[in-house]
């Protein structure tokens, strides 16, 4: 088997040229078309970009086949891609563009009117289509392609300073992850994969590349569908899905529909979950409704290429433990539980920080050497990452014990609570604030903002909340905006003068 991701995907253009690699709402892209178009785009980039190949290419859009073409074309030109979804606020896009310092900004959809990209070439959607037409039939030099330890993609995650961090994932990282998924999860040729997560969220890698590498079909549910529950419930059975990849929260939403079951989705026999805690209640109900299905619970940070552990969730597993295990580490990785202060490796049964070592671990954050050195390190010749997650090993399984800092997972999105607080403090009506996660069924249900407001003229608190949210929407993604607002005149403080978060947490999670 060749190790190049591109060679393996392109091979399907010969084996099954007319089979769809992407299909949704009447839009269909075959493997032959994917190869021809990505070849054309790779040729265009090689002829028109003279900048350093270390500089990535930003691809802006939303779950369209053109994004796949742009991703693979970028790789064929020797450059990593940075996916940026249309749902991101303008300020966030500007932050990513500044941090990534890209060689080109590619638009598969129109940019917002209030966003102007400067400092690098911008390729509009029309220009992209024109490039595909003009370079049709050209094949880029294979030697130019991303390979080995070259960056393959860079995904930006929430950062504690309010600025996103770019996680560099190499070709080798992605090969390691993809081979593990295809083998351990028994994913055969020609399956239809649900694509629920936007490409800017690393959960999408769990469906995108296993699908393309196995000659399968990617079936996206874009934001217009997922925003309307009636449309969502109608579309899912119509797509004849084989493999379900999502956050547990998305599955919970679908379980509200009594028709979400095996009878209406006869081909759906694999569920892969990542991004947040899978509750026992969710897993149990899925097993009831889908008796032919296998459910996998997985765990991993963006810094270790999506996921590094897995467990097949059975009735026996559900009954045996108070919470579901995250599973066992993939074969080419090691997992240590360490004392956060001393770094000493702890024995099974003791709680500590999860440290990941091996083939899936990123080289670090793009253009951020200091932040990289804080959490990445060399362990006996292997790349290692301090996750900041607390865990414990029992019966050989990893169990999640929460975050060691203020970072949480909400509906699959990794969020730094400090990031939200720093952004809230930009709002004119907020003097000080603290963000508290409200827990339900072993996971974060929503974010609660405790706020000391500035002087204002609003008569009702809901009017103040509306004004705050209006300002926030200008520079913060919707998923980071708190759902509940509590207003205070002051905060309880600890002995050293810091906000007493334990006290605030006990108020929210009574």
UniProtKB/Swiss-Prot annotation:
Q: Which family does it belong to?
A: Belongs to the ATP-dependent AMP-binding enzyme family. DltA subfamily.
- UniProt record, GO biological process: lipoteichoic acid biosynthetic process
Task: Summarize where D-alanine binds, as residue positions.
Answer: 202, 306, 498
Annotated EC: 6.2.1.54
Give the organism, scientific name.
Answer: Listeria monocytogenes serovar 1/2a (strain ATCC BAA-679 / EGD-e)
Under the heading Gene3D superfamilies, the entry gives: 3.30.300.30, N-terminal domain of ligase-like (3.40.50.12780)
- Where it mainly occurs, coarsely classed, is cytoplasm
CDD domains registered for this protein in UniProt: DltA
Give the HAMAP family listed for this entry.
Answer: DltA (MF_00593)
Q: Which Pfam families match?
A: AMP-binding, AMP-binding_C
Keyword Ligase attached: yes
- Protein name according to UniProt: D-alanine--D-alanyl carrier protein ligase
What is the name of the gene encoding this protein? dltA
Q: What pathway is this protein said to act in by its record?
A: Cell wall biogenesis; lipoteichoic acid biosynthesis
Binding-site positions, ATP: 157-158, 297-302, 389, 498
Localization, per the record, is: Cytoplasm
Which UniProt keywords are present, listed alphabetically? Answer: ATP-binding, Cytoplasm, Ligase, Nucleotide-binding, Virulence
Recorded GO molecular functions are: ATP binding; D-alanine [D-alanyl carrier protein] ligase activity
Matching InterPro entries: AA_adenyl_dom, AMP-bd_C, AMP-bd_C_sf, AMP-binding_CS, AMP-dep_synth/lig_dom, ANL_N_sf, DltA, DltA-like
Q: List, alphabetically, the NCBIfam families matched.
A: AA-adenyl-dom, D-ala-DACP-lig, PRK04813.1
Q: What does this protein do?
A: Catalyzes the first step in the D-alanylation of lipoteichoic acid (LTA), the activation of D-alanine and its transfer onto the D-alanyl carrier protein (Dcp) DltC. In an ATP-dependent two-step reaction, forms a high energy D-alanyl-AMP intermediate, followed by transfer of the D-alanyl residue as a thiol ester to the phosphopantheinyl prosthetic group of the Dcp. D-alanylation of LTA plays an important role in modulating the properties of the cell wall in Gram-positive bacteria, influencing the net charge of the cell wall.
Please provide, in alphabetical order, the Gene Ontology terms of the cellular component aspect for this entry.
cytoplasm
């Amino acid at each position: 088997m060749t190790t190049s991701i591109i060679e393996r995907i392109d091979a399907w253009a010969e084996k099954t040229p007319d089979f769809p690699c992407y299909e949704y709402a009447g839009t269909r892209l075959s493997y032959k078309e994917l190869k021809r178009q990505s070849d054309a785009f790779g040729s265009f980039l090689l002829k028109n970009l003279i900048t350093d190949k270390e500089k990535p290419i930003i691809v802006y859009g939303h779950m369209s086949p053109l994004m796949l073409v742009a991703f693979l074309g970028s790789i064929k030109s020797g450059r990593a891609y940075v996916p940026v979804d249309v749902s991101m606020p303008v300020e966030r896009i500007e932050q990513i563009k500044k941090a990534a310092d890209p060689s080109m900004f590619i638009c598969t959809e129109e940019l917002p009117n209030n966003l102007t990209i400067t400092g690098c070439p911008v390729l509009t959607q029309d220009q992209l289509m024109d490039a595909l037409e003009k370079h049709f039939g050209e094949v880029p030099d294979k030697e130019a392609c991303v390979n080995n330890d070259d960056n393959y993609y860079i995904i930006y995650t929430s950062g504690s300073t309010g600025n996103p961090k770019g996680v560099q994932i190499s070709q080798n990282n992605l090969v390691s992850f993809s081979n593990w998924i295809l083998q351990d999860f028994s994913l055969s040729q020609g399956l239809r994969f649900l694509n629920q997560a936007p490409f800017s969220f690393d959960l999408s890698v769990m469906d995108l590349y296993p699908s393309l590498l196995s000659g399968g079909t990617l079936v996206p549910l874009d934001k217009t569908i997922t925003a309307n529950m009636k449309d969502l419930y109608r579309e899912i059975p119509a797509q004849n899905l084989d493999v379900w990849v999502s956050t547990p929260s998305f599955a919970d939403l679908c379980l509200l529909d009594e028709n979400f079951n095996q009878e209406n989705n006869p081909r759906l026999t694999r569920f892969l979950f990542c991004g947040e805690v899978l509750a026992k209640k969710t897993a149990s109900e899925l097993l009831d409704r889908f008796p032919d299905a296998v459910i996998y619970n997985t765990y991993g940070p963006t810094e270790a290429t999506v996921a590094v552990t897995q467990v097949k969730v059975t009735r026996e597993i559900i009954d045996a433990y108070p919470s579901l295990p995250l599973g066992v580490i993939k074969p080419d990785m090691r997992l240590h539980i360490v004392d956060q202060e001393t770094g000493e490796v702890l024995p099974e049964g003791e709680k500590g920080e999860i440290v990941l070592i091996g083939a899936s671990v990123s080289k670090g954050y793009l253009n951020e050497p200091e932040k990289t050195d804080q959490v990445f390190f060399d362990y006996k010749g292997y790349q290692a990452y301090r996750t900041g997650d607390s865990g414990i090993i029992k019966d050989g399984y990893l169990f999640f014990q929460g975050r060691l800092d203020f970072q949480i997972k909400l509906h699959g999105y990794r969020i730094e609570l400090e990031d939200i607080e720093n952004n809230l403090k930009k709002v004119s009506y907020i003097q000080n604030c603290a963000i508290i996660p409200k827990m339900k069924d072993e996971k974060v249900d929503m974010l609660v903002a405790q706020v000391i407001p500035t002087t204002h003229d609003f008569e009702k608190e809901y009017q103040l909340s509306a004004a705050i949210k209006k300002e926030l929407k200008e520079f913060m993604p919707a998923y980071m905006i708190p759902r509940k607002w509590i207003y205070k005149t002051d905060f309880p403080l600890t002995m050293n003068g810091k906000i007493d978060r334990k006290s605030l947490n006990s108020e929210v999670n009574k």
